[in-house]
Regions:
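Domain-level signal for Mg2+-assisted phosphodiester chemistry and nucleotide/NA-binding surfaces
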Residues: 1-86, 119-122, 126, 132-133
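Flexible, glycine-rich phosphate/dinucleotide-binding loops
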Residues: 54, 78, 113, 136, ...
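A glycine-rich beta-strand to alpha-helix segment
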Residues: 91-136
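Short, well-ordered beta-strand core segments
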Residues: 68, 104, 148-149
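Acidic, PIN/NYN-like endoribonuclease modules and their adjacent C-terminal/linker elements
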Residues: 117-162
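Short, surface-exposed amphipathic charged segments that create phosphate/polyanion-binding patches used
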Residues: 62-63, 82-90, 142-144, 161-162
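Short, structured secondary-structure boundary patches
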Residues: 84-96, 145-154
Length: 162
């Protein structure tokens, strides 16, 4: 019997990348997409990224791997550091798609998503929060997700880029 779950993933790409790098490895995004699909029945995986023109080949490969990319323009701050703050875009997309999925998986460690995660949890639409690393995961996020939080540190063997 085929599983009829229709789950969506909403991925804070910068938070995911930095979290995995802090563990000393790089994520294979193609393997991660397949993992989400096979293990958690994720039909649609939104990847929120700050748009940098020079990364066009990377964006194309992510789309080929099955991600729906949502771009945010980036600008250097006063220190010359480039950051694409995608938090509002991710929250908006979760709510736009709300009637179209059974459960949401939010991939981040960022406490700014506390209210979103609490809302999804309270309305039984949260599959879980997937955080790269327990030590860098916001206490607020842990509080709002309660028992519906998983950490990626132990997935290195399955998801590491080789």
């Amino acid at each position: 019997m085929k599983n009829k779950e229709n789950n969506f993933a909403f991925i804070d790409s910068q938070n995911l990348n930095l979290g995995i790098q802090s563990l000393g490895w790089a994520l294979d995004f193609k393997r991660f997409r397949k993992y989400l699909q096979e293990k958690y029945h994720v039909k649609t995986a939104y990847l929120f990224v700050g748009y940098i023109q020079e990364n066009q080949d990377l964006y194309s490969s992510l789309q080929k791997a099955g991600y729906v990319l949502i771009f945010k323009p980036v600008f250097p701050n006063h220190d010359g550091e480039v950051k694409g703050n995608v938090d509002a875009d991710l929250v908006l997309q979760v709510m736009i798609e709300y009637p179209n999925y059974d459960k949401a998986i939010i991939v981040t460690s960022d406490g700014d998503f506390y209210s979103l995660v609490k809302y999804l949890y309270d309305n039984k639409k949260l599959k879980f929060v997937m955080s790269p690393y327990v030590k860098t995961c916001s206490k607020l996020l842990k509080k709002s997700a309660k028992e519906k939080i998983v950490f990626m540190a132990n997935l290195r063997e399955k998801l590491e880029y080789k």
